[in-house]
């Protein structure tokens, strides 16, 4: 079974995410045994950010890494697991709010494809970049 990075690389919807993870030097971490739960924004999600945001972040690697690790949780959590929780702590350190009352919401994003199994965890595809704070 492919790992989280291999799944992202093989799916054209995640080209911006792959570029960002590579720029932030997080590829090795996300290829490690983990396990990890990744909330993966699509290219469409990144395109919703204000113009120039991605370029600015790629030039500020510590901030980019902080935002990306806010999308990662240590451990493997399925949709069913997450829906039993109200928050989950990100690798970045901040909590992420979970709401399953109307669909599957993760802070300001909706999970559009849950539970993509990877060798070292699980991916939930989201429609927005999760905003910190």
Curated annotation (Swiss-Prot):
A Pfam family per the record: Fasciclin
Instruction: Give me the segments passing through the membrane.
Output: none
Specify the domain of life of the species encoding this protein.
Answer: Bacteria
* Location of the FAS1 domain: 1-130
Q: State the SMART domains in the record.
A: FAS1
The UniProt entry, under InterPro entries, shows: Adhesion/Biosynth-related, FAS1_dom_sf, FAS1_domain
Question: Which PANTHER family does this one have?
Answer: FI19380P1, PERIOSTIN-RELATED
Q: What is this protein called?
A: Uncharacterized protein sll1735
Organism, scientific name? Synechocystis sp. (strain ATCC 27184 / PCC 6803 / Kazusa)
